[in-house]
Design a protein with these regions (language model features):
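Intrinsically disordered, low-complexity regulatory regions
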Residues: 1-105
């Protein structure tokens, strides 16, 4: 892929990732102002840190991506690019949680 084509593609993927983040964010924050409410709620229920919840969600997508790379087969109803975009969004969410934790120290 030529550099200009890659940049154009990457910009379109980032736009879609942002759309997904906003759409799914509404579902999981339940009109709360805390972007990480869902992770914190689950973490509290099972007595682990919110960052670990995000890592578990990320790893679920990474396993799917790994299986696709190794087999070349999509084994889910969700297209592989959807998994890649979700993984990148979980990295952003995890980064935000790390930033929040560092700010609270």
């Amino acid at each position: 892929m030529k550099v200009p084509d890659f940049i154009k593609w990457a910009e379109s993927v980032q736009k879609e990732e942002n759309r997904i983040m906003l759409t799914k964010g509404k579902e999981y924050t339940v009109s709360d102002e805390d972007k990480f409410k869902n992770f914190k709620s689950i973490a509290e229920r099972i007595n682990i840190e919110p960052q670990k919840v995000a890592l578990i969600y990320l790893l679920k997508h990474m396993d799917s991506i790994r299986n696709y790379v190794l087999s070349g087969v999509e084994s889910s109803d969700e297209p592989i690019m959807g998994r890649v975009m979700d993984a990148r969004n979980y990295l952003l969410l995890l980064g935000g949680m790390i930033e929040e934790a560092m700010d609270n120290r």
